[in-house]
Amino acid sequence: MKVRSSVKKICDKCRVIRRKGRVMIICAQPKHKQRQG
């Protein structure tokens, strides 16, 4: 899980979701998991 100020889709399997007011990226590739901190 990468914590970044700006989250971007890395590949076309990345999905932008919102959980508890946080913007997160979930993907089939675990390396691409990010959340906004």
From Swiss-Prot:
Claim: Ribosomal protein is one of the keywords in the record: yes
Record-linked Pfam families: Ribosomal_L36 (PF00444)
MF-aspect GO terms: structural constituent of ribosome
PROSITE patterns cross-referenced by the UniProt entry: RIBOSOMAL_L36
Matching InterPro entries: Ribosomal_bL36, Ribosomal_bL36_sp
Coiled coil location: none
Keywords noted in UniProt: Ribonucleoprotein, Ribosomal protein
Top-rank lineage group of the source organism: Bacteria
GO annotation terms (biological process): translation
Classification via HAMAP family: Ribosomal_bL36
Entry's family note: Belongs to the bacterial ribosomal protein bL36 family.
Protein name from the UniProt record: Large ribosomal subunit protein bL36
Organism, scientific name: Mesoplasma florum (strain ATCC 33453 / NBRC 100688 / NCTC 11704 / L1) (Acholeplasma florum)
